Amino acid sequence: MRYLSVAEITRLWGISARGVRSYCAQGRVPGAFLTGKTWSIPADARKPTRLNGRRVAPTPLLARLREEMSARTSGGIYHKVQVELTYNSSHMEGSRLTRDQTRLIFETSTISPQGEGVRVDHIISHAGEALSESLLKDLHRTLKASTSDSGRDWFAVGDYKLLPNEVGGRETTAPENVAREVRGLISSYEANRAPTLEDIVSFHVSFERIHPFQDGNGRVGRLVMFKECLRHGIVPFVIGDDTKFFYYRGLSRWDVERGWLMGTCLSAQDSFKGWLDYYRIPYSG
């Protein structure tokens, strides 16, 4: 995909650079992502239409995350989320980086344009958007671009899997059926205008069982849960590496005992509430 700068989009859309950045920061330009303080915008992106009536204001948490992301603030909740999401999710997939090493990566900005920080920025920027296939694929593309997998023709970075895969010894959806099942899952989920935490977790379970991408499904799925909590005003959570046994067991036993996974997520949510209390960010629930 070809990306354009804010200046180039300004000329195409006929609006100010400030207006372009505002649309991007509000998550209204699908596929746009922030690297440092520079927006990269898909060349085929369409100018968002004006919103009529009053807009729903972002929660205090989302507003703070976007403010600190824009300013690249260190030491606040944005920095905390970057480090904890990256450290825990990567460790669950086999990374050996320590938490201090992960923190140092962000504090010294030693990350690539397609690195961990971009993925966290992506879900913050697009938190207000409805779920879509393109959003899931964009998230997978930012996850896998610039990795060894991106050089493999059969891997399909940013697209659905070409080869069958399994998770935890369990068969997943066949490649030829993935698009249909993902569309059905999204359609069913989006029909609920006020999803609960359990609805979001249930979507995650179904997504993991489809396992639409060749690899990276767990990380994409956990980022989507975080995004959806932000979107619907629910306190988000980070699944800790130290609770991955309960998380994976909860995924496998969801049909017979939802308490395993819900308990793990609620415990993680309580920990996140502790961070919000520390940073003096109000929340509901």
Protein language model features and the residues they cover:
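FIC/Doc superfamily catalytic core
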Residues: 1-29, 33-285
